[in-house]
Amino acid sequence: MRNTLKATTLERKFPLLAVENGCIVSKDADITVAFRVELPELFTVTRAEYEAIHSAWYKAIKVLPGYSIVHKQDFFITENYQPDTEKDGLSFLSRSYERHFNERPFLNHYCYLFLTKTTKERSRRQSDFSTLCRGRIVPQEITDKETVTKFVEAVGQFERIMNDSGFITLARLTAPEITGEDGRAGIIEKYFSLSQTDTTSLKDIGLYPEEMRIGDDILCLHTLSDVEDLPGKLGTDFRFEKLSTDRSDCRLSFAAPVGVLLSCNHVYNQYIFIDDHAENLKNFEQTARNMQSLSRYSRANQVNKEWIDEYLNEAHSKGLISVRCHCNVMAWSDDREEIKRIRNDVGSQLALMECKPRHNTVDVPTLFWAGIPGNEADFPAEESFYTFLGQALCLFVEETNYKSSLSPFGIKMADRVSGRPLHIDISDLPMKKGITTNRNKFILGPSGSGKSFFTNHMVRQYYEQGAHVLLVDTGNSYLGLSQLIHNRTHGEDGIYFTYTNENPIAFNPFYVEDGVFDIEKKESIKTLILTLWKRDDEAPKRSEEVALSNAVSAYIERITGDKSVTPCFNTFYEFVRDDYRRQLERKNVREKDFDIDGFLNVLEPYYRGGEYDYLLNSDKELDLLHKRFIVFELDNIKDHKILFPITTIIIMEAFINKMRKLKGIRKLILIEEAWKAIASANMADYIKYLYKTVRKYFGEAIVVTQEVEDIISSPIVKESIINNSDCKILLDQRKYLNKFDSIQNLLGLTDKERSQILSINMANHPGRKYKEVFFSLGGTQSAVYATEVSLEEYYTYTTEESEKTELFALADKLGGNLELAVKRLAESKRNPGLSTT
């Protein structure tokens, strides 16, 4: 079948000549330098930061010579999440997570910047002079080499200014990235196929009177090519009401509605044409005079003259730079009904910007052609409008969607806009970049905020990446996960200790496997004995601290020198009662400085025959060294003023011992509400020691709390825990909206972080079930992500009593197979007709 329409090859019409020294050279002798652009993430930029970004663009563009073109091109492509279910060693829950997000659609953003040097003649040409309209293109020769050299130098300055801004990163594209190479398409090929995949293929381009097609895709173009289409006032950003409150502000760039907020395949092209500023103003002066002389024939001429005068007055009085500008949104679809919907969506988003939506059907081919990377000088001059540089820059999209961390270690969280899974490193990468100085975390989330779900989700992924995890809990939050790990590892991991009267948790704080007592070990013993001896509100005297320190040091010297003495609390008590008493007598230490009888009397319950003699004299050492997932459940003693703090300290001390022996392996201790047991003045130094030691031995200390009052009323929490936790994690705080000022001050949060926290769960997608979480790293990097999990993970993590009862009852029916019970229960919820048995 013959094609009866006029046809030509892309080769005949192709406007580009070559790529030399990383620059695209057009057949009309225009030079273009191409960059890949990294923008800040969505919802993470404040008004002041948007103004700083605007200022950086302004300074950078000012260094470019006359008759340069700045073309920013933002591709937004709908893609589907591809799960990594074939990965070796993937656990049951990880596989469930990946399957849950299988083919989840999301909008991916690719941003490019093209800086072009053209000539005065080319910059004035209209659409009928486009290379698309010429029968044959004869390559032109670059006659002025010095102009090219100066332009390349200016581009280098432009790049430095933008990269030094701290917000936007430019990376110059290489020749293979522009033209492509074996198996990888370049940006030009990708543009012609409306794709960003490396394996894209070229498609036929159809130019018809009523539409333009690329392959099966129909193009839909909206333009901002007249100053009448713009609102009366432009700004760098606007308030995003969906995520703002009367106490917080969420900001987006002015053009964000046609960026990541427009959920269809589209390209947003932003052009700024830098002509000769002085000549522009001179031409306007001449036009104003002409309008004045013709004003008697039409009032419109007088009005236009006044507008031009105002433009000139602004330019001269404020030193503003006169430029031309054009923006367009080019969307596409292979479905005509879809194109109608897209046309309405684009029009609505432009209306949100208070712009007049102008659906352009006439200039689609020439504007598409001018959008080819390197062919910016082919832009039809009649499609641009005069404005000032500052106003033109307000039409730039200044944010992108969330990105994954470039790190082998991390946790999977979901993008709060699209729900796409992201790999987020909140431990190692921030330390490498100098954003944080430790890996410790402080988690604050009220009851019902999804705190337990998040911590379960986090520690599971840490465990699966080789970390040793020790949890101190007071609410059975980790029972399901621990049991699942226990069954899967045949009892090697997932060890669950519960404190009962029949089987209490007992330790020996004086036992050291290698016989070496370092400073941290001595400090933990002193803190433990101080906790037994003094009440929380009773501070020891300096003389008492010295006496206790000397007693511990002397006892350690005894047991390391005399192997016949069994290290335990009983022998320590006897040593103080007999040997140390004689030492004090020889030194003439007075009773008011250290009351040894009072000391022994208070500690007697922990000595042989006392009420708690089992607690510190264990002859069985818990094997915490080789078990990678351990939970201590202290719910039964959380209200016991003696047992709770002592048991918590001993667990922490045992964790420190574990850390010393496991070199080069990540260790994590997570303390839920049990931190309250150690938040006393006497323990402040010990907690600081713990945090210092954790950092030294590749560890992470994580404290979790739900009561705001607890952290507000405790100076120990601020000084010892919060100040030593560079990662702050907060969940929904809306119930504490009226108290948030004190929380903000306590945690040292910025106003930007406050706005992000108060936006949590404000505009959740109705079709997805998730809770949002805020992360702050070192007070300089922060974002909100979503904890969205599969049904299998949901039933493993749930703390809802009825759901836990249902799950464990089903597991009992299945012979204790919790994994199978989770699978059956999840499947029955997905397909209500199925039975769990």
Report each predicted region and the residues it spans.
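Short secondary-structure boundary/capping segments
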Residues: 85-90, 127-132, 374-377, 485-489, ...
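Short, cationic low-complexity segments
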Residues: 132-161, 353, 445-450, 796-821
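P-loop NTPase motor domains
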Residues: 47, 51-63, 262-263, 355-356, ...
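Conserved P-loop NTPase motor cores
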Residues: 427-460, 469-481, 495-503, 635-755, ...
